[in-house]
Amino acid sequence: MAVRQRERAIDIFKGLLVLGMVYCHCLQFFSDPVIFPQGQKWIDPINLITFSGFVFSFGYVCQLAYYSKPFAEVWHRMLATAFKTLLAFYISGTAYRLFIDQRPLEWTTIKPILLLNDMPGWSEFLASFTYLILLGLLLFVPLKWLGRRKWAGLTAAGLLLLTTFMPYGAIHAVPWAPLVGTRDFASFPVVQYFPYYLLGMLFARYRTGFDWRVLAGAAIATGAFAWKWLSGADASLPERFPPSVWWVAGPALLLYGYYLLSRWMEKYPLPFLPLEALGRNVLWFLLMSNVLIFALKSNQPLLLLGLLDAFWMELGLLAVIGFSIWIITKPARRAALSNDTKM
């Protein structure tokens, strides 16, 4: 039986997201918007598209790796993926508390993180990844049903936007924040972002490429975001924490552009191999870049970088992390291709 080749386009798509996210983190930790005001013009669009983009890519890959197969064959792999992302949250969250907050390495520091009662900064998204894959596992049967019925899936995605109107102020339990959001601290609630998971499934299921209907829908969604943004008295961005319907809808056109760009890049493999490598090892790059950035900020608190220097820092960090993958990965394994989820 022939082995299905890995979909390189979605790896490139994820690689673009990683490239943007790590650059954004470098700017946030080592730049100053007062001194380098242009940095915020990069941070805002990267913030807009990144988490939604990862949710989309997760839905896309899960459709190929899991929902196209019987539950009995894949449930343990989904659990393993969720466990990996949870461990990544534990490591990143602990590193943030130790390096950035200068907390002591004690049980009182680590225990709340392990129990999901503490969501350290720049690590919450990893907890949300865990919730996302667990939600995808718990809803395996209905999601598989929706994936086979395009219009039902699109309707469900639209209806999920209504969850952005829930009373966030009534939610105070920390473990609920990655699921449904809160106003108490920054979080990435997977229920509100779940429309992108469904869209990712549908794109994978129906092999969506360029489609005028998709382009029009994405343009309307992003246009609504732009209208809300620019029509405000102070022209401030729509609410991100917790996400408003405008914020969730906002990146649609940009992400569709990323998606089409990645499909074009797929036709020219050699120049974009580094992006593919980022996309195949998303979780490792996000985790290790966080740990290295936290450690560097702790060691170099006065370091101040402009846009170009922050980019060089990002490339250095990604090179170090890529080297760590290269020295522990066997060539035969590197050559093997699969559609399994790697976050």
Where are these regions (language model features)?
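Alpha-helical transmembrane segments and their immediate juxtamembrane cytosolic regions
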Residues: 1-343
